[in-house]
Curated annotation (Swiss-Prot):
This is Gamma-lactamase MBL2. Belongs to the metallo-beta-lactamase superfamily. Gene3D superfamilies: Ribonuclease Z/Hydroxyacylglutathione hydrolase-like. The lineage of its organism: Eukaryota, Fungi, Dikarya, Ascomycota, Pezizomycotina. CDD domains: metallo-hydrolase-like_MBL-fold. One of its GO terms (molecular function) is hydrolase activity. The gene is MBL2. It comes from Gibberella moniliformis (strain M3125 / FGSC 7600).
Length: 239
């Protein structure tokens, strides 16, 4: 299983309205390789990859599932099929290419089904049924956005968070009531150059002067999040 594919090498084969927007903005995209190539270069057969999981459909995460064999399923989050399909080229202004799931099974995760459970405040899904990999419903940034927890050790249990785009800056989830700005830092990274303690210095530049509140909220500017308020709720669950 692979979680997200990054940007595809041949990004100019993305839907035409997206490509036109990139070129018109003056941005430049250069991609030297892709996930499928990296796996093969390191001895991993693509035939053994049972699924590609999209945290969400944006181009910098979706890659090109067609670089994997048809036996590799494409896993998407809730609401994808009803909100995204049909896609490009059936819908000319769609930014999602229908070739992504052509010739393969497209599976939409049901967080309320038999494998559904709660991890903290998140609706979760036990992907393999053995507690080794969990998908987390983290909507807001895009339709059906998902994050994941990958188990790294069994005893004591530890996990790696695969966030997708649940947040775009660590200041969106730090500090918090569980990891507040400390009153003192030891050792002091500022040495003897200032008399005030470092914690106070950071609090002075905090927008809300609150040692337990994150520095930033998700932007409400159009185009960045599908639902900024829902994105904030997902970040609050992460905290």
């Amino acid at each position: 299983m692979v979680f997200d594919l990054g940007v595809r090498k041949d990004w100019e084969n993305l839907p035409e309205t997206f490509v036109a927007g990139i070129k018109g903005s003056g941005c430049k995209i250069e991609v030297q390789t892709d996930v499928a190539s990296l796996l093969q270069e390191n001895g991993q057969s693509l035939d053994d990859v049972g699924a590609v999981i999209w945290s969400h459909w944006h181009f910098d995460h979706a890659g090109d599932p067609q670089t994997f064999p048809g036996t590799t399923d494409l896993i998407v989050g809730p609401g994808f099929k009803s909100n995204i399909i049909p896609a490009y080229p059936t819908v000319r202004d769609s930014h999602v290419n229908e070739t992504a799931w052509e010739g393969r099974e497209l599976i939409e995760i049901d967080f309320k089904g038999d494998k559904g459970l709660k991890i903290g405040k998140f609706d979760a899904y036990d992907f393999y049924g053995d507690g080794s990999f969990y998908l987390l419903s983290s909507p807001g940034h895009a339709v059906g956005h998902m994050s994941a927890l990958a188990r790294t050790t069994a005893d004591p249990p530890s996990f790696m968070l695969l966030g997708g785009d649940i947040a775009h800056h660590c200041g969106e989830f730090r500090p918090s009531p569980y990891t507040p700005l400390p009153e003192m830092m030891s050792p002091n990274p500022l040495g003897r150059t200032l008399s005030a303690c470092p914690g106070r210095l950071f609090l002075n530049i905090h927008p809300w002067k609150d040692p337990e509140r994150p520095f930033f909220d998700p932007t409400t500017e159009p185009g960045w999040h599908l639902e900024a308020a829902e994105a904030k709720q997902s970040i609050d669950k992460l905290i």
